[in-house]
Amino acid sequence: MSAQQSQSRKTTTAIRQAKGPGKVVALTAYTAPMARQLDPHADLLLVGDSLGMVVYGLPSTLGVTLDMMIAHGAAVVRGSTQACVVVDLPFGSYQASPMQAFESAARVLAETGAQAVKLEGGVEMAETVQFLTARGVPVVSHIGLMPQQVNTVGGYKAQGMQADGSERILRDAQALQEAGAFALVVECTAEAVGRRVTEALQIPVIGIGASPACDGQILVTEDMLGMSGARVPRFVKQYAQLGDEIGRAAQRYAQDVRAGAFPAPEHCFGVQAKA
């Protein structure tokens, strides 16, 4: 990355200071071509462990490895120049101890060029967040529905629907802010919970199925673009149907190949005459 590119990229400080005056625009990205398209429009690009399901067809995020995250994180950094790039720490790469988390995060930052890491967990991860931030690792925390804990909570269900769950999420949010997280993702909660957390914190709260009151929003880009099949979460708004368009393009290509219409003369190289 050139010095000019580095200077133009949004920093974690800029994201932290976005609390209040506007909305943080965040999307997922897993590849350089997609990052290139999203970069002019997004404040933050998240290389999420959702890539396990979106890119690799895994049934959950649990099979994603640190090496996978690093490879895709580096690709997104290479494909972008403006957005702040944040990379998820995958399941099993940070839960054992704060030192394990630091070693994983250090690899991510050093090998990708990303600006920060994201990790799931509430009060129980506050010590780890504090350990990381004290050692120069910027952290985005993630609470509410936490996909890495899907087996513990019994599936992908909205969180904070009861009073005790609402209070737990608020305690998680406050503990993570105190630990030094510069932003917080709140996923799939009751709307009132997302609103309450946003109002209670001084750091930006980025919602995904949380509340329009959040300081920003994030979606899985392939869901937003209509590339994820028929079923998408209720909180997703689809702004295109690129899956259908890709299918139609592939159909036209197949028809041309089978009919001998492609490649046409304009797609072929002629033999050059000797001078």
UniProtKB/Swiss-Prot annotation:
Primary enzyme class: transferase
Cofactor binding note of this UniProt entry: Binds 1 Mg(2+) ion per subunit.
Molecular function terms from GO: 3-methyl-2-oxobutanoate hydroxymethyltransferase activity; magnesium ion binding
Family in the record: Belongs to the PanB family.
HAMAP family: PanB
NCBIfam families: panB, PRK00311.1
Protein name per the record: 3-methyl-2-oxobutanoate hydroxymethyltransferase
Organism this protein belongs to: Bordetella petrii (strain ATCC BAA-461 / DSM 12804 / CCUG 43448)
Classification of source organism: Bacteria, Pseudomonadati, Pseudomonadota, Betaproteobacteria, Burkholderiales
Gene that this polypeptide is encoded by: panB
